[in-house]
Curated annotation (Swiss-Prot):
GO cellular component, one term: photosystem I
Function of the molecule: Apoprotein for the two 4Fe-4S centers FA and FB of photosystem I (PSI); essential for photochemical activity. FB is the terminal electron acceptor of PSI, donating electrons to ferredoxin. The C-terminus interacts with PsaA/B/D and helps assemble the protein into the PSI complex. Required for binding of PsaD and PsaE to PSI. PSI is a plastocyanin-ferredoxin oxidoreductase, converting photonic excitation into a charge separation, which transfers an electron from the donor P700 chlorophyll pair to the spectroscopically characterized acceptors A0, A1, FX, FA and FB in turn.
Protein name listed in UniProt: Photosystem I iron-sulfur center
Domain 4Fe-4S ferredoxin-type: 2-31, 39-68
Location relative to the cell: Plastid, Chloroplast thylakoid membrane
Disulfide cross-links: none
Lineage of origin: Eukaryota, Viridiplantae, Streptophyta, Embryophyta, Tracheophyta
Binding site for [4Fe-4S] cluster 1: C11, C14, C17, C58
InterPro entries assigned: 4Fe4S_Fe-S-bd, 4Fe4S_Fe_S_CS, PSI_iron-sulfur_center, PSI_PsaC
Gene responsible for this protein: psaC
Topology versus the membrane: Peripheral membrane protein
Cofactor: [4Fe-4S] cluster
Enzyme Commission number: 1.97.1.12
Primary location recorded for the protein, binned into one broad class: plastid
Amino acid sequence: MSHSVKIYDTCIGCTQCVRACPTDVLEMIPWDGCKAKQIASAPRTEDCVGCKRCESACPTDFLSVRVSLWNETTRSMGLAY
C-alpha cells in the first residue's frame, strides 16, 4: 500500500531524507528556493513502506517531509466525537 509523502518548501536540500529512505522513494531535484539549489521530491510514493525514516532524518525545526499512513488517517477519523 502506498502512503502520502509531502515535501514542504522548508526543505534545505541536505539530502538526509533521501539517504535515510530504504526503498528509494525520495530523490533530489533542482530548485532555486534554498542555498543548496535542490529540494527533495517523492516520485515513487507507491514504494513507500511508511517507516518514516525520512521524517526522523530531517534536521529542520519544522519537518520538511511528512509521511501520512493510510491506516493513521482512518484511525484518527474515528476519534472525533
